[in-house]
């Protein structure tokens, strides 16, 4: 990548400070990746005494790839040149197909645009030059990103076999859409690997860059943008020492080193920014292809193994079928602390998991639900204050209100939680045995890191169960106002959850 970096600095308006270098990263586990470094000896001769930040990189908008690039293509006359005419024709065809409308967003259009440029670059009829073509050929197409959706990695079969519940279905579906579209437009050619490479490279490198809404307003919006050289800066929340912003005068994108916490004893350090303030590990694996290390609280949005759910029965009810009928996604959040792991029991999604195990009938031999005659829904069995049982068709929100909504339902919640913990303990035994038999192809792969992280989490939960230590966040820290629980959304569904959650 050294040659690509030099070309970009010589042939685009991108500027780099004298104290900044770009070379192979020193981050643990970052095999073959690149990073940005700052030389503090040189920095001290360049910065002002009262400066709180220092400019390391400046990237004008003309040296980026965003929706602006695509709008320019669509606005140009097809008579200007053959390349423009071809790309515009293919883009217009993609946008015109109603089956594609659900997939049209800025990031996906950038992917389509670059896939088309890459295909035309292979065609000797067209001669593609300029910054975007160089960046595509020398950076994006030469970067292998092992996202779970990348079917051209050596662990692709293992992702499908052991982690199908974590495969991002919208990603998979969009890649399939592109493959079908390109196959129809370029008959007899197979571009599946190229499409996968471009998609994974773009997804992992694209940044949300602020843009002004106009000259007469202070409002901003964010636009997905590929920013050369800035995309070499790695993520580390524990060692973050830089951030990027826009220069309001020029609209350039600027990487700033933060000078407040500079260690005067070191000569050089790697530059780090934050990709996300809270690290949700499934998101990082799906988008960036790695798991960050941190001493801060991290989150794993854990999805139960469908093989276990589909064969396990609780009081005669198939767990997988129940959650499907109730439109419950069988996932929960594991909060990873330095010395323990806890389950986030403060979110609605966790309450939805508990519905099946409700003990409000006060009889462990009785189940709170009854399968309908059509086999596609469950009726809830309720008991009034006189002990009379009635059967009602309730959705998951109504079940939460009926079972756990009142103050006098605390006893039921505690009994229900006990049942869930018993279920979870059995699950951990099943899952641990299943994944322990995996024959790892590489000790340094993204798949291996993900597998090892799950092993560690399951072992931690099992150890806490066996030593009678609390595994629920609220039960342990709910009354401690100093400890804040991180808030993160669940990642997009796998195809299993997508099918189950469809109305």
From Swiss-Prot:
Q: Which GO terms describe its biological process?
A: methylation
Residues forming the SET domain are 52-276
Q: Where in the cell is it found?
A: Cytoplasm, Cytosol
- Disulfide bonds listed in the record: none
User: Which reaction equations make up its catalytic activity?
Assistant: L-lysyl-[cytochrome c] + S-adenosyl-L-methionine = N(6)-methyl-L-lysyl-[cytochrome c] + S-adenosyl-L-homocysteine + H(+)
Q: What are the protein's GO molecular function terms?
A: [cytochrome c]-lysine N-methyltransferase activity
Keywords on record: Cytoplasm, Methyltransferase, S-adenosyl-L-methionine, Transferase
- State the EC number(s): 2.1.1.59
InterPro entries registered for this protein in UniProt = Ctm1, SET_dom, SET_dom_sf
Region (SET-like): which ranges? 190-291
Coiled coil regions in record: none
Gene Ontology cellular component terms for the protein in this record: cytosol
Q: Which family does it belong to?
A: Belongs to the class V-like SAM-binding methyltransferase superfamily.
Task: Share the domain note from the entry.
Answer: The SET-like region, although related with the SET domain is not detected by any prediction method.
Function, as annotated, reads:
Methyltransferase which mediates trimethylation of cytochrome c (CYC1).
Q: What is this protein called?
A: Cytochrome c lysine N-methyltransferase 1
Q: Report the source organism.
A: Kluyveromyces lactis (strain ATCC 8585 / CBS 2359 / DSM 70799 / NBRC 1267 / NRRL Y-1140 / WM37) (Yeast)
Question: What gene name does this entry carry?
Answer: CTM1
């Amino acid at each position: 990548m050294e040659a690509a970096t030099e070309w970009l600095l010589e042939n685009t308006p991108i500027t780099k400070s004298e104290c900044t270098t770009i070379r192979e990263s020193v981050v643990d586990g970052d095999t073959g990746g690149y990073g940005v470094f700052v030389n503090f000896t040189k920095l001290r001769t360049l910065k002002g005494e009262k400066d709180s930040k220092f400019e390391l990189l400046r990237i004008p908008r003309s040296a980026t790839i965003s929706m602006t690039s695509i709008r320019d293509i669509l606005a140009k006359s097809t008579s200007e040149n053959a390349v423009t005419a071809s790309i515009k024709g293919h883009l217009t065809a993609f946008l015109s197909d109603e089956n594609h409308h659900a997939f049209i967003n800025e990031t996906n259009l950038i992917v389509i645009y670059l896939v088309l440029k890459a295909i035309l670059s292979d065609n000797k009829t067209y001669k593609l030059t300029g910054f975007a073509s160089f960046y595509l050929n020398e950076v994006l197409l030469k970067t292998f990103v092992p996202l779970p959706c990348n079917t051209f990695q050596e662990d692709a079969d293992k992702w499908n076999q052991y982690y199908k519940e974590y495969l991002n279905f919208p990603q998979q579906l969009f890649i399939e859409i592109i493959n079908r579209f390109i196959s129809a437009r370029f008959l007899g050619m197979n571009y599946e690997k190229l499409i996968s490479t471009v998609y994974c490279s773009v997804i992992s490198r694209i940044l949300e860059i602020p843009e002004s809404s106009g000259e007469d307003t202070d409002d901003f919006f964010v636009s997905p943008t590929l920013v050369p050289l800035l995309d070499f800066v790695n993520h580390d929340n524990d060692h973050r020492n830089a951030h990027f912003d826009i220069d309001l005068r020029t609209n350039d994108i600027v990487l700033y080193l933060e000078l407040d916490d500079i260690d005067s004893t070191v000569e050089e350090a790697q530059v780090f920014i934050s990709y996300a303030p809270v690290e949700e590990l499934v998101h990082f694996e799906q988008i960036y292809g790695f798991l960050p290390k941190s001493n801060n609280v991290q989150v794993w949005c854990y999805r139960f193994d469908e093989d276990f759910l589909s064969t396990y029965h609780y009081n005669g009810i198939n767990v997988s079928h129940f959650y499907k009928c109730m439109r419950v996604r069988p996932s929960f959040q594991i909060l990873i602390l330095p010395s323990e792991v806890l389950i986030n029991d403060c979110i609605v999604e966790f309450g939805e998991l508990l519905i099946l195990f409700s003990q409000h009938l006060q009889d462990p031999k009785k189940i709170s639900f009854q399968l309908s005659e059509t086999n596609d829904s469950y009726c809830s069995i309720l008991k009034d204050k006189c002990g009379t049982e009635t059967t009602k068709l309730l959705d998951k929100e109504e079940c939460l209100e009926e079972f756990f909504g009142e103050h006098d339902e605390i006893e039921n919640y505690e009994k229900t939680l006990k049942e869930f913990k018993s279920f979870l303990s059995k699950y951990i035994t099943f899952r641990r045995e299943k994944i322990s038999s995996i024959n790892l192809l590489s000790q340094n792969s993204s798949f291996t890191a993900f597998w090892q992280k799950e092993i560690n989490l399951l072992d931690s939960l099992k150890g806490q169960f066996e030593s009678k230590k609390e595994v629920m966040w609220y039960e342990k820290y709910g009354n401690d106002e100093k400890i804040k629980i991180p808030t993160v959304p669940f990642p997009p569904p796998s195809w299993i959850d997508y099918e189950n959650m469809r109305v």
